[in-house]
Amino acid sequence: MKNKILIIVGIVFFVVGMIILSIYLNNMNKVEISKEEESAMEIMKVTSTNFEEEVLNSDKTVLIDFYADWCGPCKAYSPVVEAVAEENEDIKVVKVNVDDAQDLAIKYQVMSIPTTVVIKNGQESNRAVGMMSKSDLIEMVK
């Protein structure tokens, strides 16, 4: 009889522990997702529809990150671009997904990604293909 009670109590503790662990892990996942969304919200994603307004007609120097969601180097480069956006309010940083805006990729002759293009006064002033350090990226914009 005591063995049955101990087994039942053990099972109850195990189930309660698993429920608590599940809730904890679920909340941790939500925190990680919200941090990703928070940082991603700072950089505007530009499309063919709003490119002229947001980039060509901008009063600021614009840094364009041409990327694709499936591109590994683009994902690795993204935190560098985000850091430049956060630390340099005088630069407008935007992202263009080459899969969604193929016409812009063609217009700006983006053959490899990531490609970074700098626009000043509506005209391309500089470009680089591949990943760069934060300091090189800032230097490129100046």
What is each of the regions a protein language model found here?
Residues 73-88:
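Typically the conserved alpha-helix immediately C-terminal to a functionally engaged Cys/Sec
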Residues 1-41:
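N-terminal targeting signals for export/organelle localization
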Residues 59-62, 66-70, 112:
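Short pre-active-site segment immediately N-terminal to redox-active cysteine/selenocysteine motifs
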Residues 5, 120-142:
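Non-catalytic, surface beta->alpha helical segment in thiol-disulfide oxidoreductase systems
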Residues 43-61, 102:
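A short beta-strand-turn-helix
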